[in-house]
Structures are given as C-alpha cells and as structure tokens.
Regions:
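Conserved helicase ATPase core of P-loop NTP-dependent helicases/translocases
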Residues: 114, 128-139, 290, 300-301, ...
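Post-DEXD/H (motif II) to motif III coupling segment of the RecA-like Helicase ATP-binding lobe
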Residues: 164, 172-240, 412
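Conserved helix/coil segment N-terminal to the catalytic DExD/H
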Residues: 134-165, 176-177, 181-185, 347
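A short beta-strand element within the Helicase C-terminal
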Residues: 342-343, 352-365, 390-393
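Conserved SF2 helicase motif VI
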Residues: 82, 203, 367-391
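Conserved pre-motif I regulatory segment
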Residues: 2, 11-17, 33-81
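Conserved interdomain hinge at the start of the Helicase C-terminal
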Residues: 255-294, 300-305
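Walker A/P-loop
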Residues: 74-99, 104
Length: 421
C-alpha cells in the first residue's frame, strides 16, 4: 500500500541458533515429537521438573473451573481461554497448586502483577510468595510474580531451571509488537520449565498472530464458553447511539480513501459529537461509568465538558500517572467515591477489576474483538448490588462506522449481549 512501516521487521523468527543448537518454543513440542517418532529419531527432553512444592491449600472452584483446571493439568502445558469474569486468576492459582511445582507467574503490567499476587495471598501464605519487579528480585519458594519487562532485562541464565511451571497472564499480548515478541521470546525460551501455560479471555488477535502465541505455549488445552459462566456474570444490554456525524473531506486522502488518523482526530474534536456523549454521561451520573477512547486528548475534551461538581466525581487514567496515583484512582472507583472513569482502550484492556462498574461508553470506534469483549467484561462482574450493565456504542453516519458497528454487533452476540440498534 506504500505506507511507511518504520522499523517493523519483514519476518518474525520464533527460533534462535546457538552454535549447533536450535532453540525452539516448547509449544511446538508435540509437533516435533510426532515427526521425530515417524522418522525414528532418538531424542531426549531436558525440561525442569525437579522442584516440587506442597502448597497445602484448597482453592475453591466452581464446577466449570475445576473441569478446566483438571484438563490443563492433564495436558501438561497449553492455553486456557476463559471469558472476563470467569475467574482466570483463580484457576491459574489452582492450576499451580494442583501441579505442585515451584512456579513463575508473568504479567505485562505492575497493576496486574499486584492483583494476581493479592489473589494468590488469599490461598498461599505470603512467606511462600515472591516478586520480581522494579529492579528487585525476591524469589518465592512457592510462586514468584514478575513483569515481562523486568524479566527481559535480567540475566535469565540464573533462572533457567529455577521454576518447573510458568503462567503467562493475558497471553494473547505475547505476540504484540516486534519488541514485545522479542521480550516474550527471550524470557519464555530461556526458562526450562516443563509446564508452561497461558491465560486469556480471547486468543483472537486483530493481526492474526494467534499461532505465534500457541507456538510458545502450546495449543488450547481448555476453553470455557460464555454459557458456562452465564450464572456467574451479569447480562449486558447494548444501545447503538447514532451520532449523526458525517465524514468530512479532511478525513480523506487525495485518492478519496479514508485517512484513519485524520478520521479519529476529526471525530475526537467534534463538539456536537462530544456534547451528545456528555448528554448520556449526565443521564447516568448516579451510575458507575467507564468511558473508553483511543485518544487521551479525546477523553480530556469530554472530561472538560463535565460540570465542576461532576469533575469531582471523575478520574482520568493516563500513562503519565504515577503508580500510586493510578492505584488511588482505582481504589476510589472501587469504593464508590467516583462515578466516572476515563481511560484509553490500552489502559483498560487488562487488569481493571472494579466490580462496581455498570456503564460502558465506547466513544471512539474499534473493531478489535479482544478489545470489545474485554471492555464489555469490565461491567459484567457480579457484585452485591442488583446492577444492570449497559453499553453505549457511539456510531457515526458514514459507511465505515456502520460496518464497524456491524462487526462489533457480532462480538456482542457472541458474549450473549442484547443489542438494540
């Protein structure tokens, strides 16, 4: 298409060479074994499985969770797919305890690391838990929690045989940008653990790199369906909000095709559109609203439209916030002190566990299945109230926007949402 791709490599290599050795992801083990057996090659598997650990705990599971965990234990490695709100972290902890091996739990954000650590501490004494983050390395005798960024900067030779089990949380992110892929490749291929698992709500990627994730961790060992958890999460209703905004010539290239960046900038800056969004925010000022956009500038514009008394009831998450400020903002939302949370899709994609949320505003278009379904999942978590989950999907008056909504509509249907359009 003649577009600049920056430093993006043409090919992504999943193997590396070290002298006469070829290092291949463990997820390909079953395929290699089949070919070796057919060719009658002699081979040995040198993976780490000598660090047994007795957790002496019982992680309570629903029937569907127990079936999933048992299947993963039997398979030995692979990917567990479970919808948002189904208890992925709970199942991951139970999986480690059932395996009975010293384990490493990998996340891509500190927030997610802390949430997973806190959940594990409900079942496993903290003296058996450790963290590798922020340059500090504390290895736990039971489970160690680490961010992928910190691990990638360590000398992993010291950790090669340290763990017999590895859990990669939100593993669909493993095959993200080339930089992220290099990080995950370095870390996952450097660990000799026999048991490697991935946890995710959806293996789908908009770039089609699902097979890359499976190459590192193995195929899907179990998939929990929406119907399996329908009694554990609340249903959501989706309302299509027609903005009436038509496409402008500033959004088009010379040849008449849509310039996506210009389109997003135009929609984000459109005063009439933002005032329509404000109207729905004011209507639900007593509810707990999650407002998502692709641009922080757009979120700021809508936030600034709120009356001063409602700005006091709003939090705006951004990547420049300190860890403490972000944690405090989330805690205030969890406690019901705030009614509005503004965030980009990327910031809200994973690790945002606020059961009180019951309204979702998708104020700029996206058709990424993982993003849409995870965003909806944020408002479907059960709490002690009799809450109703509502999604507002803002759709503009031009063909691309309507087509994108049609795509999202199919995603909503897949997770049993009722859609009014």
């Amino acid at each position: 298409m003649g577009k600049w791709v920056g430093n993006t490599p043409k090919y992504l290599y999943l193997f590396s060479e070290n002298g006469v050795d070829v290092i291949i992801p463990v997820g390909l083990l079953s395929i290699l074994k089949k070919y070796f057996n057919l060719a009658k090659y002699n081979y040995s598997i040198n993976l780490s499985d000598d660090k047994k650990f007795k957790f002496n705990t019982n992680v309570e599971l629903y029937d569907y969770q127990k079936i999933a965990v048992d299947s993963c234990v039997k398979k030995g490695y692979g990917i567990l797919i479970a919808p948002t709100g189904s208890g992925k972290t709970q199942m991951g902890i139970a999986l480690i305890c059932n395996l009975g091996y010293k384990a490493l739990w990998i996340t891509h954000t500190t927030d997610l690391l802390n949430q997973s650590y806190d959940r594990a501490s409900q079942y496993v004494d903290k003296k058996y838990l450790g963290k590798i983050t922020g340059g500090k390395k504390q290895i736990g005798s039971g489970i160690t929690f680490a961010t992928i960024q910190t691990l990638a900067n360590l000398d992993l030779l010291d950790l090669k045989n340290e763990f017999n089990a590895v859990i990669v949380d939100e593993c669909h992110r493993l095959a993200g940008t080339p930089t992220k892929l290099k990080q995950f490749s370095k870390v996952v291929n450097s660990l000799a653990a026999r048991h490697k698992y991935g946890l995710t709500a959806t293996l789908h990627r908009s770039d089609g790199l699902e097979k890359t994730t499976m190459a590192y961790l193995g195929s899907v060992c179990f998939s929990i369906e929406e119907n399996d958890v329908k009694d554990k999460i609340i249903s959501a209703t989706v309302f299509k909000i027609n903005t009436g905004i038509k496409i402008d010539t500033c959004c088009l290239d010379i040849d008449g095709t849509i310039n996506y960046n210009n389109l997003i900038n135009y929609l984000a800056a459109n005063e009439d559109r933002n005032k329509l969004i404000l109207r729905y925010l004011l209507k639900d000022k007593q509810e707990y609203n999650l407002i998502l956009s692709q641009r922080i500038e757009h979120l700021i514009s809508v936030y600034n439209l709120l009356p001063d008394e409602l700005k006091e009831k709003a939090v705006l998450l951004n990547s420049k916030m300190s860890k403490n400020s972000r944690e405090q903002a989330i805690l205030k939302m969890q406690a019901g002190e705030k009614n509005y949370m503004f965030a980009t899709y990327s910031l809200a994609k994973e690790g945002l566990d606020i059961k009180r949320l019951n309204r979702l505003h998708l104020i700029l278009p996206t058709k990424d299945k993982a993003v849409v379904q995870q965003s909806v999942g944020r408002i479907r978590r059960c709490d002690e109230s009799d809450k109703k989950a509502i999604v507002y999907d803002y759709v503009d008056d031009f063909i691309k926007s309507q087509k994108d909504f049609k795509t999202r509509k199919s995603f909503y249907k897949n997770i049993n949402c009722e859609v009014f359009d």
